[in-house]
Design a protein with these regions (language model features):
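Inter-helix linker motif
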Residues: 24-40
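Short, surface-exposed amphipathic charged segments that create phosphate/polyanion-binding patches used
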Residues: 39-51
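Acidic/histidine-rich catalytic cores and adjacent linkers
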Residues: 1-23, 55-225
Length: 225
């Protein structure tokens, strides 16, 4: 009775446990995990584009070492494969966090591969849904589903079906604003601290690091009142 809402990913086993242990709780799909579905679909599209470029590159003459001669024919497949291989972070990151170089790479993708860029916009569109929340978020999600269904990118068409399947829990997250973002961030930081604490003989040092860095623990230092 004390648990009224549960934020979790969409795994079936989690739904079963919540239904068994907290039958009256409202289950909310965690926005971080839902957007991660779109990010995974986008990366699958990037790998498809990269593999297509590698296939083209294999049909091109092998390049010799050193600077190519002036009469050497262009190798668009090699160049495209090279640039796409390093495009992951430009596609993954939020637009406001892009470096100048990553922004240029994204602009190159928009110009040279409209399908991959459309996949990027779909990922950003789903992220926007959770930034507006509430009824506006649900209206935006309706538009996103319609767009994804007719985008002609099979993996995003399948993602639209998955979103519809879990629509009730996603709507609940939009209504109640629940997210595991803070917990996920804290877990990531603790993993970093675990690497820092490697080599200590017991977990006490790791616990102390976590308390100091993340727990708000501010002990009084000797000689400093």
């Amino acid at each position: 009775a004390l648990i009224t809402h549960v934020s979790a990913d969409a795994a079936d086993w989690i739904a079963d446990v919540v239904a068994d242990r907290c039958p009256d709780a409202i289950r909310c799909a965690d926005p971080f995990h839902v957007v991660a579905w779109a990010t995974e679909a986008l990366d699958a599209e990037r790998r498809r584009a990269w593999n297509d470029a590698r296939t083209l590159a294999r049909s091109e003459p092998k390049r010799r070492r050193g600077r190519p001669a002036n009469h050497t024919p262009p190798s668009p497949g090699h160049e495209r494969a090279r640039r796409l291989k390093g495009a992951r972070y430009a596609l993954w990151k939020n637009p406001e966090d892009l470096t100048e170089r990553q922004s240029q790479k994204l602009a190159w993708i928009a110009k040279t591969d409209t399908r991959l860029y459309r996949a990027y916009l779909l990922k950003e569109g789903l992220r926007h849904v959770f930034s507006v929340k509430g009824q506006d978020g649900k209206d935006a999600l309706d538009k996103w589903i319609s767009w994804a269904r007719r985008c002609r990118i099979p993996i995003f068409v399948e993602l639209a079906r998955r979103i519809v399947k879990h629509r009730d829990t996603i709507d609940a997250a939009l209504d109640h604003g629940l997210s595991q973002g803070l917990i996920e961030s804290t877990n990531t930081k603790i993993r970093v601290l675990t690497r820092i604490a490697f080599g200590f003989h017991n977990p006490t040092a790791l616990i102390a690091l976590a308390m100091l860095a993340l727990g708000g623990h501010r002990p009084t230092l000797p000689g400093r009142g």
